From Swiss-Prot:
Similarity remark: Belongs to the NqrDE/RnfAE family.
Enzyme Commission no: 7.2.1.1
Subcellular location: Cell inner membrane
Record's protein name: Na(+)-translocating NADH-quinone reductase subunit D
Pfam families linked: Rnf-Nqr
Role noted for this protein: NQR complex catalyzes the reduction of ubiquinone-1 to ubiquinol by two successive reactions, coupled with the transport of Na(+) ions from the cytoplasm to the periplasm. NqrA to NqrE are probably involved in the second step, the conversion of ubisemiquinone to ubiquinol.
NCBIfam families found in the cross-reference section: nqrD (TIGR01939), PRK09292.1 (NF006777), PRK12405.1 (NF009070)
Amino acid sequence: MSSAKELKKSVLAPVLDNNPIALQVLGVCSALAVTTKLETAFVMTLAVMFVTALSNFFVSLIRNHIPNSVRIIVQMAIIASLVIVVDQILKAYLYDISKQLSVFVGLIITNCIVMGRAEAFAMKSEPIPSFIDGIGNGLGYGFVLMTVGFFRELLGSGKLFGLEVLPLISNGGWYQPNGLMLLAPSAFFLIGFMIWAIRTFKPEQVEAKE
């Protein structure tokens, strides 16, 4: 029972209690760049979840055989291999989205969330809990991406997943798209508002005054 509770906590805790973007402020670069559309935010979420979960699993699997002096290099090699797989799959089956995501798929290699979980958790834990931890942190990352992407696409273009939701003036409706929401600064402010909202709801996440 306790094991099941721990696995459940590993999946759910990174969403609000220990969100990698909102609390740890990691992975912000891609969060600013790929959230103009829900479609790209969703695909990026799946990509990061895939890489984080499997890199955690493989690092944990061989953790006792990795010399301490080269552990970061080994982790990077595993992560890079998985990112190449993701990149090739996207180019083969989702080429348009792959072009929109551009270099940010490759930059998953240097994503602090992926590297951080491999070093802090997978190197000290069994493979299955490490895999679940990767899924959880991918969900936490995706929660922020999808929330930001929802508001940016809805207010920036009046659409969700490319489908018109708010009747646009150009089509005889009433909504004038807000172009500012499609620029990177809007994502920065939205993430800031999310951090404020989460820390208002969970005051224990506020840093203690020095």
